[in-house]
């Protein structure tokens, strides 16, 4: 057996790491030079058995790396297996060309220090491995403007502070259980980490009239939450709104009055109620909103701005306010906004909308939303939540702050921020989710230089919101070819920073005839090819990358 360990040592700024296959540890494979077009002294082949592999040892600076293989194989597909330290991935590579070519299997995150890699390519040849550093920039900041033009000075200051920290720090947040007389979640975090969350989310659930009608006990009150906030703590409020009427009381369906916010435990029809403003059920909607307004008024009187997150997770359909589809939901959201802001004069609210995947049509509109959140309950405690972040950046990047408004796990902040994932804040759901988080992970995150805890908050009330209009920072370097083209369109764009990329094609009437959302892409050259079944004519190709945009004319021929 050939045995050769290679250690690559890098210092300073992360550079490309190149591992020549023939310099690795060869297990059941051999160096060959029969084929042409390889680099170095040869390539490695003979991956015939499952245990055959080439292994490397190397050192790397901390960061995100794109993994690229120089390979060759004769079949259309070749199966591979890659292990880097404890991380493992399998898949198939698609043949391109007749000799050696480069194939990428995506990105990995490496901590600073020593690493090991093992690679298998069944019935193929490995020339080299490249680890190409990828740098992600911060998210684009939205305009410094709240939806409520009469927002209180403290609400404006809090929003200005959140804007200033977006892409620099993530605020540590925690959901508090409303059924404990003590602040058990906050106390647990303090006991484990020695710190308190900068932001705590409380629930107005038991102030719903159909819960109070059953004599519900208020274990915590807005006065308690105001006392916790003091002058510097940040308050978020949600509302599990028990349906205004028509609750199902049926133990055989596991339905009781206290489950009245679930679609399955009420027959209340929000669409019908909204359609008839003279109906009793519409009046009950207003009654409930007015009751909650009285509780929110306490925060305004105490000069406590509120990150107000009502009607959450509507597109999931499991709550009655989302049971009838997007249009009644948006109508209810706007009614709630108008009633609280303009009827009750509540100007201390920063409105937080909770987005669900693939539910863009549920968005109430920029005029009614200040921040967009996402509630994520991942099975994997190490989940990066990249797809959630990328979707939100594609839809709202440069328009709205984005927050992880609920999470059942706690992502490793050092890792996700290297991927350019900078939530405005995270909020861990209460037990059992909070106690399921590894205490070491909780402590590391709370002590991270990329996270702000309560003791690290500045005097955010001194921040000033300067309304601005975000303008494109410049043109993108965009190329489209062949031009003219017969159905196949190639797009190449140089991305100065990581950004969500959207490709659109418009006809001369201004109608969009094609759209492709690529999600968040790293800085550098980005290219795609598209098969377009378009009539002959002149089209406009537009590429948006965050708040950058470029357009080119393209001619389609047969």
Swiss-Prot record:
Q: Where does the record place the CBM6 domain?
A: 17-137
Q: EC number(s) on record?
A: 3.2.1.78
Q: What's the pH dependence, according to the entry?
A: Optimum pH is 5.4.
Q: What is the uppermost EC class here?
A: hydrolase
Q: Does the keyword Hydrolase apply?
A: yes
- Which InterPro entries does the entry link to? CBM6 (IPR005084), Galactose-bd-like_sf (IPR008979), GH26_dom (IPR022790), Glyco_hydro_26 (IPR000805), Glycoside_hydrolase_SF (IPR017853), Secre_tail (IPR026444)
One GO BP annotation of this record: substituted mannan metabolic process
Regions that span the bilayer? none
Key words, A-Z: Glycosidase, Hydrolase
| Catalyses which reaction(s) | Random hydrolysis of (1->4)-beta-D-mannosidic linkages in mannans, galactomannans and glucomannans
For molecular function, the Gene Ontology terms on record are:
carbohydrate binding; mannan endo-1,4-beta-mannosidase activity
Catalytic residues at 313 (proton donor), 406 (nucleophile)
Any Pfam family from its record, for instance, is Glyco_hydro_26
Occurrences of domain GH26 (ranges)? 153-455
Activity's thermal dependence: Optimum temperature is 85 degrees Celsius.
Q: What does this protein do?
A: Acts as an endo-acting enzyme with a requirement for at least five sugar moieties for effective catalytic activity. Hydrolyzes carob-galactomannan (locust bean gum) effectively and to a smaller extent guar gum, but not yeast mannan.
Provide the family line: Belongs to the glycosyl hydrolase 26 family.
Q: What is this protein called?
A: Mannan endo-1,4-beta-mannosidase
């Amino acid at each position: 057996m050939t045995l050769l360990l290679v250690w690559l040592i890098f210092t300073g700024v992360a550079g490309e790491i190149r591992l020549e296959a023939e310099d690795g540890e060869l297990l059941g494979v051999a160096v060959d030079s029969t084929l042409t077009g390889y680099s170095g002294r040869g390539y490695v082949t003979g991956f015939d058995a499952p245990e055959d592999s080439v292994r490397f040892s190397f050192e790397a600076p901390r960061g995100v790396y794109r993994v690229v293989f120089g390979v060759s194989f004769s079949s259309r597909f070749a199966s591979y297996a890659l292990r880097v330290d404890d991380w493992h991935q399998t898949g198939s590579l698609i043949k391109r060309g007749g000799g050696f070519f480069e194939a990428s299997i995506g990105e990995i995150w490496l901590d600073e220090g020593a690493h090991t890699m093992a690679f298998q390519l069944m019935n193929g040849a490995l020339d080299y491995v490249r680890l190409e550093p990828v740098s992600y920039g911060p998210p684009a900041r939205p305009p410094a403007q709240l939806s409520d033009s009469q927002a209180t000075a403290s609400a404006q200051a809090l929003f200005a502070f959140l804007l200033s920290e977006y892409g620099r720090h993530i605020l540590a947040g925690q959901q508090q259980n409303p059924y404990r007389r003590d602040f058990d979640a906050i106390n647990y975090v303090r006991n484990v980490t020695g710190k308190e969350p900068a932001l705590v989310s409380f629930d107005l659930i038991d102030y719903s009239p159909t819960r109070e009608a059953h004599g519900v006990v208020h274990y915590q009150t807005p006065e308690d939450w105001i006392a916790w906030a003091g002058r510097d703590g940040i308050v978020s409020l949600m509302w599990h709104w028990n349906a205004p009427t028509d609750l199902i009381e049926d133990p055989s369906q596991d339905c009781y009055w206290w489950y009245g916010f679930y679609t399955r435990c009420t027959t209340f029809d929000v669409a019908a109620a909204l359609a008839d403003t003279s109906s009793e059920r519409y009046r009950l909607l207003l009654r409930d909103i007015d009751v909650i307004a009285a509780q929110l008024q306490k925060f305004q009187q105490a000069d406590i701005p509120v990150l107000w997150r009502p009607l959450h997770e509507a597109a999931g359909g499991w709550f009655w306010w989302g049971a009838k589809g997007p249009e009644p939901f948006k109508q209810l959201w706007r009614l709630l906004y108008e009633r609280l802001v303009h009827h009750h004069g509540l100007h201390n609210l920063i409105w937080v909308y909770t987005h669900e995947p693939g539910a863009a049509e549920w968005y109430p509109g920029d005029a009614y939303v200040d921040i967009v959140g996402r509630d994520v309950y991942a099975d994997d405690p190490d989940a990066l939540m990249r797809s959630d972040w990328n979707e939100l950046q594609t839809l709202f990047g440069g328009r709205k702050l984005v927050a992880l408004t609920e999470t059942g796990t706690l992502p490793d902040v050092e890792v996700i921020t290297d991927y350019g994932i900078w939530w405005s804040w995270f909020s861990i759901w209460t037990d059992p989710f909070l106690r399921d988080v590894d205490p070491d992970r909780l402590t590391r995150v709370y002590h991270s230089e990329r996270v702000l805890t309560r003791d690290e908050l500045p005097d955010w009330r001194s921040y000033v919101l300067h309304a601005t209009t975000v303008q494109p920072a410049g043109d993108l370097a965009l190329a489209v070819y062949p031009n003219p083209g017969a159905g196949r369109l190639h797009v190449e764009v140089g991305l100065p920073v990581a950004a969500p990329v959207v490709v659109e094609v418009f006809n001369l009437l201004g109608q969009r005839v094609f759209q492709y959302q690529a999600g968040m892409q790293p800085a550098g050259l980005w290219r795609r090819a598209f098969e377009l079944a378009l009539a002959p004519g002149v089209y406009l190709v537009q590429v948006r990358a965050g708040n950058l945009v470029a357009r080119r004319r393209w001619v389609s021929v047969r």
